Amino acid sequence: MNLSLVPLNEDFEIVKIKKIKDDSQKKLLNNMGFVEGAVVTVVSESYGNLIVKIKGSRVAIGKDIAMRIMVNHI
């Protein structure tokens, strides 16, 4: 399932990030910790964005990007 569909406040493991055409966006996600094996938690949704907890930080990502991040419930 993709990250945009998960319930709030539950932990998920990133299993795959589908192809992102913009290299700078891909690099930014990588630098924020969005890599295979990382644990993420969606803490809220607001105006088409998700607030995600990853590696002890909270970051906002758009649903378009969240749809490319495939996760499994842990």
Residue ranges of model-derived segments:
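C-terminal structural segments of small proteins and small subunits
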Residues: 11-12, 51-74
